[in-house]
């Protein structure tokens, strides 16, 4: 939202010029913009930026758990209009919605991002060089799956090249929604990024995603 305010006050309360949603995830972004030019500060300069998130509870559809199909090499999770396939030695390898394949490659953990100028100045690429390939060569050593209530939970246990372990839980409900939980168990606590890579097919030209503030660009 945008609203004018006197910057000379220590605190200012500005009502939102729109109604807040009754359900769902809402993000409010507030910026402080320099109105007039000052010595060394041009007009329009963004002096401050902040975000506030509100997650209004949304009632889930009450659907039975999807079907769990276990095979020698793969584990499948099927529901109306969707299918997930996990490879026992790879992890999540396929997501289909309404017959359309979404993934172009295996979903895998990722710990690296493009270094910024500040990172370069602090020699962080040298310090954290291990993480550049840690996710690329992470190995899925074990895959388990079970039905719990309205969910099928598949757990992929990864081992990094230095022996650290990373379990990832995929909880899939009857509507095809997948909640992912990554639990870090390693001894190294400083790393450039902690996330998952989802290689999507090039044919998917209209994809939207939600990215929280201050994550990697």
Question: Which stretches of residues belong to each language-model region?
Answer:
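Short, small-residue-biased leader/transition segments that mark boundaries at the very start
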Residues: 3-8, 217
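Functionally constrained cores in energy, signaling, and assembly domains
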Residues: 7-9, 32, 76, 104
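Exposed aromatic-hydrophobic patches
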Residues: 12-19
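Terminal connector regions
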Residues: 20-59
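Short, intrinsically disordered, charge-balanced linker/junction segments flanking boundaries
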Residues: 1-4, 209-210
């Amino acid at each position: 939202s945008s609203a004018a305010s006197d910057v000379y006050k220590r605190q200012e309360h500005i009502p939102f010029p729109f109604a807040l949603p009754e359900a769902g995830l809402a993000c409010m972004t507030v910026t402080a913009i320099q109105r007039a030019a000052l010595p060394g500060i041009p007009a329009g300069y963004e002096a401050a930026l902040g975000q506030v998130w509100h997650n209004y509870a949304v009632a889930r559809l009450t659907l039975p758990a999807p079907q769990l199909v276990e095979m020698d090499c793969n584990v499948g999770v099927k529901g109306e209009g969707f299918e997930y396939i996990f490879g026992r030695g790879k992890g999540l390898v396929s997501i289909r919605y309404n017959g359309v394949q979404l993934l172009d490659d295996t979903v895998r953990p990722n710990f690296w991002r493009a270094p910024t100028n500040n990172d370069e100045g602090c020699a962080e690429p040298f310090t954290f060089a291990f993480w550049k390939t840690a996710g690329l060569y992470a190995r899925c050593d074990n895959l388990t799956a079970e039905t719990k209530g309205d969910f099928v939970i598949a757990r992929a246990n990864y081992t990094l090249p230095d022996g650290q372990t990373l379990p990832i839980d995929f909880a899939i409900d009857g509507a095809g929604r997948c909640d992912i939980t990554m639990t870090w168990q390693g001894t190294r606590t400083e790393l450039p990024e902690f996330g998952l890579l989802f290689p999507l097919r090039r044919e998917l030209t209209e994809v939207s995603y939600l990215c929280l503030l201050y994550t990697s660009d």
